[in-house]
Amino acid sequence: MPAKASLEGIEQVWSRVWEQNGTYRFDRSVTRDEVYSIDTPPPTVSGALHVGHVFSYTHADAIARFQRMRGKMVFYPMGWDDNGLPTERRVQNYYGVQCDPSLPYDPGYTPPTEPPGRPQPISRRNFVELCRNLTKIDEQAFEALWRHLGLSVDWSLTYATIDDRSRAISQRAFLRNLARGEAYLADAPTLWDVSFRTAVAQAELEDRERQGHYYRLSFTSAAGDTIHVETTRPELLPACVALVAHPDDKRYQHLFGSTAVTPVFRVPVPIKAHPLAQPDKGSGIAMICTFGDLTDVLWWRELALPTRPVMGRDGRLLPEPPPGITNAEAVAAYRTLAGLTAFSAKAKMVELLRASGDLAGDPQPTAQAVKFYEKGDKPLEIVTTRQWYVRNGGRNAQLRAALIRRGRELSWSPRFMRSRYENWVEGLAGDWIISRQRFFGVPIPVWYPLDDSGEPDYERPILPDDAALPVDPSSDTPTGYHDSQRHQPGGFMADPDVMDTWATSSLTPEIAGGWTVDDDLFGRVFPMDLRPQAHEIIRTWLFATMLRSHQEFDRLPWRTALLSGWILDPDRKKMSKSKGNSVVTPMSLLAEYGSDAVRYWAVSGRPGTDTAFDTGQMKIGRRLAIKILNATKFVLRFESPTLRAPHVAHVTEPLDRSMLARLADVVAAATTGFTQYDYTRSLECTEHFFWSFCDDYLELVKERAYGNPDDPAVRSAHAALALALRTLLRLFAPMLPFVTEEAWSWWQEGSVHRASWPARQELVGDADGVDRANRIDETNGSDEAVEDLLGLASGVLAAIRRAKSEAKQSMRASVARLTLRGRASDLAAFALVSRDVRAAGVVRDVDTAEADVPLTPEITLG
């Protein structure tokens, strides 16, 4: 035990010891019922971790530590989600490069030391190499932070979503989806990010409010009448394929089945009826364009309309006019739009409408919700592309209902989060697009045969053998072909796309557990016990993982989902790097306050509850950690064999028994909290007792504890102190792992994190299981139950302290007389603790008087 207790440097000391001793190493020889397995969220490797990561990962770690102390063999791996768009963007910004797949590989390429003014184009292979190199550096920094925070993961179980095993499992799962008809290739309207030039799934959308204008356009009916249509996107007028109104809208019922002519381009389009048209929006009749939004897609599909694409994948209008625009004047008008961005094309289209007299009135300002890719900075467009899909219930009510039922089998913490899952499933508008037109990801494991003219046959994909996985079709050759046949007539071509990162991270239980590559391990850990994650990715990670497990195993991937809330800034706004209000780095917090203090703040946030970022809470946590060390030093100063091997049978004094009985209730409450995933409740009840223990019990028992160890009353104090300390250190251990390990090491063998979770019987149980801790000592001839003696003694001591404080006297000043008035039972109870109260309060004389009132102390200072 050090001469002076200190928190400085204990993280480095104990992290090293835990690693050397294999404290958290998973033992795969145990059976499934002995295992508690956790599907740890693999953080996205796209820069630095933020305080939200520290917050939520601490919650899962507290649960892992509790389960380990309860006797479970905890399977707690760590993964890195190191492929996909966020990683690519990180590499682009870090090095100042841009991937150009048309460029040849440069084996001697060295990235710029400083990002150039304009991105430097490099080959795909060079770009992927940069991605791999930078993610390794980032992952080392991530691991260092997690170790400093005290995550009790088994680092030998670490995986990365781009490593060979993960890629093989991801490709294998996709091919099995394909074999069962759950994956398919289709040409369809696709949400498209024009900056990243890739498809985007529904789960990755984000609505952002933007200021726009309604433009009133004049169409002409077949009878020559004007039909006013209001739109916020006049630049899509050349893509117009129909007008639509509600079937009950009497203003337009006479027009259904007829045609109208578009302004400027003079293209006839049908006038249709559809129940999704909104009579109270604008003029009540809308133009259907291919494609302005998802409603256009729905109308186009259900009304069997033609396609007139105008928007290119680069976000600019296509160079050639769409079908239908044929006369010279219309073609000339379109030429003025070709090649312009959507923003510029809108301004030009308004000019054309004004010039033709087809713009009625002035544009009217409006606020509108515009869809963005959650990581993008330009509005999404909808373009027709060939993409791979996985069926997710978006177009299948039966599958959707099955996934709702599956969600109801899952235990949700907190329970109300289930409604978010169900709302998402019920609102699915289409199947899941899993292909991405990017570079650093898991390749789609498919080739296509080329016919004699060199055109791909998408109906007959070439698939790899299972034993060959993982494959990269861009460099690997399919069975039966030679690489010289690549891109040659009669040869083959690779699918150029990679999978959405969620397509791989939706398989984290399978990847961590070794599905198809380590059947023994997988059988011991799957289905997993816990999925901890943030609530905002229920729609992506949680749902996708549920879907893949449902398709592959027809069961849940885990038993419980633990959802964490957001971290809020002082203005009650979510803290995030994108908002610019998350400037404090986790490592700086850990350095300033200590890991246990930061964990204390994190565990103060209940599941699913948004929590304020509060360094004040961290200061309280640090004070608590220091107090734990000081309280331990106080208890261990008593040289007594009883301290080393305490037993409840050694506890004979009523005050000591009362304290242990109260602590036994805390053990029960803390245990219930953890089993219900309410770690905050466990912390609160333990901390509340601890401060009372330090402020009241230690003061009350101090004088007696310094007595002769041969005195049974002194031995009782020593045993009670040791039992309480041993229990408190274990109760705090899941939340405050470093300080509890430090204090434990001063007087106990092994690690506190491998010690058993405290049980009530350790504190109050007799051999026959009878709880006698809160009863009058049987040597006094009574079995009458006594109310909380510790509370009674603490109340009298508090009155004595208050009297001294008001008189501005030292707490060691003597009390000439303590007079107690109260009922006979209360006075008898006080007699059992009188010795300790008198010693703690420095009381010379005590008088008692029976009265039908609550116990009332009167203090006469000396």
From Swiss-Prot:
Motif ('HIGH' region): 43-53
Segments carrying motif 'KMSKS' region: 574-578
GO molecular function: aminoacyl-tRNA deacylase activity; ATP binding; valine-tRNA ligase activity
EC numbers on record: 6.1.1.9
Coiled coil spans: none
Catalysis performed (reactions): tRNA(Val) + L-valine + ATP = L-valyl-tRNA(Val) + AMP + diphosphate
Example of a GO cellular component annotation carried by this entry: cytosol
Pfam families in the cross-refs: Anticodon_1 (PF08264), tRNA-synt_1 (PF00133)
Keyword vocabulary terms for this entry: Aminoacyl-tRNA synthetase, ATP-binding, Cytoplasm, Ligase, Nucleotide-binding, Protein biosynthesis
Record's keyword annotation contains Aminoacyl-tRNA synthetase: yes
Binding-site residues for ATP, renumbered to this chain: K577
Chain ranges passing through the membrane: none
Keyword Lyase found: no
Matching PANTHER family: VALINE--TRNA LIGASE, CHLOROPLASTIC_MITOCHONDRIAL 2, VALYL-TRNA SYNTHETASES
Domain notes: ValRS has two distinct active sites: one for aminoacylation and one for editing. The misactivated threonine is translocated from the active site to the editing site.
HAMAP family the UniProt entry points to: Val_tRNA_synth_type2
NCBIfam families the UniProt entry points to: alt_ValS (NF000540), PRK13208.1 (NF009687)
Protein role: Catalyzes the attachment of valine to tRNA(Val). As ValRS can inadvertently accommodate and process structurally similar amino acids such as threonine, to avoid such errors, it has a 'posttransfer' editing activity that hydrolyzes mischarged Thr-tRNA(Val) in a tRNA-dependent manner.
Family: Belongs to the class-I aminoacyl-tRNA synthetase family. ValS type 2 subfamily.
Annotated protein name in UniProt: Valine--tRNA ligase
Organism the protein comes from: Salinispora arenicola (strain CNS-205)
Lineage, highest ranks first: Bacteria, Bacillati, Actinomycetota, Actinomycetes, Micromonosporales
